[in-house]
A protein has these predicted regions:
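Small-residue-rich beta-alpha loop regions that form the catalytic core of phosphotransfer
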Residues: 3-100
């Protein structure tokens, strides 16, 4: 594994369901050749700060949570003027999380 990925998730989004799938998610990315750095948000702006901190240290950022988590990651990456790919696994309760 020579690729690195930051996985940021909101443990409270979607009634905490993401936690039951966490090992499966990490396993999928490991099989894809990624070393996964996992960060569970604890307070507002955590995802934003982690995205800014890691955008130059990883090859991919994936987040899971509601629209707020996604917004924080995208904003953090955009402020750094980075072109790093961002993935999103919806886990929130809002309707915008259920559309494609």
């Amino acid at each position: 594994m020579n690729k690195k990925m930051l996985f940021v998730f909101n443990p409270k989004a979607g009634k905490g369901k993401i936690k039951t799938n966490l090992l499966d998610i990490v396993d999928i990315f490991n099989k894809g050749g990624y070393e996964v750095i996992i960060y569970s948000t604890q307070k507002p702006k955590d995802a934003y700060e982690k995205a800014k901190e890691y955008e130059s240290k990883v090859d991919l950022i994936v987040c899971s949570g509601g629209d707020g988590t996604l917004d924080e990651v995208v904003t953090g990456v955009m402020e750094k003027k980075s072109s790093i790919p961002i993935g999103y696994i919806p886990a929130g309760n809002q309707a915008c999380d259920r559309t494609t």
